[in-house]
Amino acid sequence: MTDQSHQCVIIGIAGASASGKSLIASTLYRELREQVGDEHIGVIPEDSYYKDQSHLSMEERVKTNYDHPNAMDHSLLFLHLQALKRGSAIELPVYSYVEHTRMQETVRVEPKKVIILEGILLLTDARLREEMNFSIFVDTPLDICLMRRIKRDVNERGRSMDSVMAQYQKTVRPMFLQFIEPSKQYADIIVPRGGKNRIAIDILKAKISQFFE
């Protein structure tokens, strides 16, 4: 855990795929932005840091286990968090779920007073945990996560239901049990029921608001 006097405060939100992490992150961002302004708060998704696979064939890319820590470029994310804390802008990678690789373009992210970082594997990496001022684990039952994941991946990411189910059985559930669920022990706050937990969101807003005082 880092000292709260740092210029840029990093808040980590982790949990299973489709647990409601993104909803909590976007809700906190939207509501706090209305209070403090867009220049003071931002969101960075861990998904942007999936490793570049442009050197692989599409057949090889689709075999990648996206739920294993090795699929993530956490070294780059770590360097970017350090840069933001120094007051430097970063070039955020852009990842395509259709092409299964990183795109050539990037998105410039300026340092903010508060950065909300969200992703499934954030708490599995000790380097990232050390950069966080505090961390949250969204604890949603796996059956609910699966239903949400099917709806999301089919509608938003161009996947078939069969491919989503096959991936869930082969990698998503096993990797959750092996890596993601055990990382819950490192969270400072555990939020049940995901983005629908209004009381938890209000508590988190109050906690984060302290960094703007």
From Swiss-Prot:
GO molecular function annotations of the record: ATP binding; cytidine kinase activity; uridine kinase activity
Top enzyme class: transferase
One CC-aspect GO term: cytoplasm
GO terms for biological process, alphabetical: CTP salvage; UMP salvage
Segment forming the signal sequence: none
Keyword Nucleotide-binding appears in the UniProt entry: yes
Catalytic activity: uridine + ATP = UMP + ADP + H(+); cytidine + ATP = CMP + ADP + H(+)
UniProt-recorded name of the protein: Uridine kinase
Organism per entry: Salmonella newport (strain SL254)
Gene name tied to this protein: udk
